[in-house]
Amino acid sequence: MAVKWTGGHSSSILCLNANKDGLVASGGEGGDLVAWGEDGTPLGHMQLEGADDVTSVLFSASCPTKLYASHGETISVLDVRSLKGSLDHFHVNEEEINCLSLNETESLLASADDSGAIKILDLEKKKVTRSLKRHSNICSSVAFRPQRPQSLVSCGLDMQVMLWSLQKARPVWITNLQEDETEETEGPQTPGRLLNPALAHSVSVASCGNIFSCGAEDGKVRIFRVMGVKCERELGFKGHTLGVSQVCFLPESSLLLTGGNDGRIRLWDVSGKMEKLQKSPARHIHRKKAKRAACPTQGGNSRAPGAEDEGHAKILPKLDIEHGEKVNWLLSTKIKGNKSILVADQTSCVSVYPLNEL
C-alpha cells in the first residue's frame, strides 16, 4: 500500500524531484510548487508567476537547496528553504517547456519544449550556447548522459529518439520508433486491432551513461546502448497495455521503473535480459524472426505482467503495482534512509511505495 502525501496541492501533480537530503519538490497545475519533508509534511508552497503549469522540477546536486522549475516558457531558480520568490529566471524557450536536465558538472541546463527545440543554457554565463532543433513535433523529454557532460538524448511526439553531441550541435544518431515498429509488425495482423503510434514520452539514462530507455504511446519500453556515435537497440518489450508515460532508471542500477496510462507501475531488471541476448549466437536471427512475430501476449489483460522481448523470451517485472491512476511522474529516491518510489498522478497527492526488498 502506498503512503499518501496530502495537503500540498489542490490539483494534479505533474512532476517530482528529490535532493540528497531527502527533501522533495513537486510541481503542479496552475503554477503550484510545493517542498515536502521526508515525513510527507508540506514545508513550503508558492505559486509561480503567470500561473502556468509547473512541468519539470530539478534540484542541484552540488547545492541541494537550489531548485530549477519550468513553467510555461520560463525557468525559475528557487531556494527551497524560502519559497517566497525566485533567485533568478530565464526566458529562453519560445514555447512551453516539458522537461529540464542538468549535466553532471552542472555547467549546462537543457530545456525541451513544445516547438521541438532543446535550449542549452550555460549557467555560468547565463545565456543560451546551443539551440538544438531537429524534432519536428513536441520534444517531450531530454536527459544528459552521466559521465558525459557534452552528450544528451531526447525523444518527442515525432516518434524520434536522438543522441546529441554538443560539439556538433546536431544529432549524431536518430531512430524513428514508428518505422522500427512497422518492420516488427509485418505479417498477419489481428483483425480490427489498432496500433497506437509510438509517440515517445520519456527517456532515462542509466548511471553508466551508455544505456538508456525510452517509453512510448504504443505501450513499449525500448532499451538502447550507445556505441560511440551510434546506438543499438538492445531490447524492446510491451511493458504496459496503454502508453508508457514515464521511464526511470534507479540510481547506480540497471533496474528500470516504468509507469503507464494503464495505471500500473513496474520495475524491470533489463541487464540480465540484455546479457542473454548478447551471449546468444543467434541474437540477430532472433531479432529478424521477432519482426515477424505477432504482438505480445499481454494484449488487453493488464494482469498478465509478462512481456515478450525481441528474442521471444518473456521478461517479467520484479515488481508490479496496480496504482490505479495515470502516472504523470516517477521518481526513485531514499526517504528516511529507505529506497522508495514516489509517484505523481492525476490526483493532488504524492504516493510513496517502499522498495526495501530490492
Swiss-Prot record:
InterPro entries (UniProt xref): WD40/YVTN_repeat-like_dom_sf, WD40_repeat_CS, WD40_repeat_dom_sf, WD40_rpt, WDR53
Residue windows of the WD repeats: 8-47, 92-131, 134-174, 195-234, 239-278
Pfam family, one: WD40
Disordered, as annotated region: 288-309
Record's keyword terms, sorted: Repeat, WD repeat
Top-level division of the source organism's lineage: Eukaryota
Record PANTHER family: WD REPEAT-CONTAINING PROTEIN 53
Family: Belongs to the WD repeat WDR53 family.
Designated name of the protein: WD repeat-containing protein 53
Species whose genome carries this gene: Mus musculus (Mouse)
Gene name for this UniProt entry: Wdr53
